[in-house]
Design a protein with these regions (language model features):
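Extended, charged low-complexity regulatory segments
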Residues: 1-192
Length: 193
């Protein structure tokens, strides 16, 4: 089904805003990683230079603190790499889901999650809510969340092909059918692991 001009404009705006947020997060995270890396390197250097003047327990505490910071930085670096992967194609699917007794939620699905102001603007394709896209067409649907089964209705199921932050193809699909385009995206990304 073809999108109206108004719907297409809304989708283009969402893509533009999502792309800006991803670019912003890449910039902020890149700078943060660089600064933390320098501080961690300097801390370790000072720790080893002063090893003769500090006792074993202080050395152990310093090393443990250093390892904790390094682990935290690795997590940030992993997310940074994921953001770089999706920078020009942030999502490939969407479902509009109304949980029983709640407002409609537009769930955009991509290769990793993207948050803005404590809300997800893109959900990771492996998240529980993303199963709505894979397991259901239009109509009654449910997914298993940490707090239990969530029931509701899907009113829209949309697929996208995005290249260089431009909508190449957008179409609504009311059936639970994974198309060739989606299979291609998933197989490319899973082989990148």
């Amino acid at each position: 089904m073809a999108l109206s001009k108004d719907e297409l404009k809304l989708e283009e705006n969402y893509l533009e805003n999502t792309s800006k947020e991803i670019s912003n997060q890449i910039d902020v995270l890149g700078k943060e990683i660089h600064v933390k890396k320098e501080k961690l390197t300097e801390f370790r250097k000072v720790l080893w230079e002063d090893k003769g003047s500090i006792d074993a327990s202080e050395m152990q505490t310093g090393l443990m603190s250093s390892e904790f910071e390094a682990s935290f930085m690795l997590i940030k670096m992993d997310y940074y790499r994921k953001l770089l992967k999706i920078e020009y194609s942030p999502y490939f699917g969407r479902v509009d889901f109304t949980e029983n007794g709640c407002d409609l939620r537009k769930v955009y699905i991509g290769l990793t999650n993207v948050e803005k102001d404590l809300d997800y603007i893109v959900y990771d394709w492996r998240s529980p809510i993303a199963s709505l896209f894979y397991d259901y067409g239009i109509g009654k649907a449910k997914y298993e969340a940490p707090e239990g089964e969530i029931n509701g209705d899907i009113s829209l199921r949309r697929q996208y092909k995005i290249e260089n932050n431009k909508l190449v193809r957008v179409f609504d699909n009311d059936l639970n059918v994974v198309d060739e385009c989606l299979q291609e995206v998933l197989s490319e990304k899973s082989s990148d692991k």
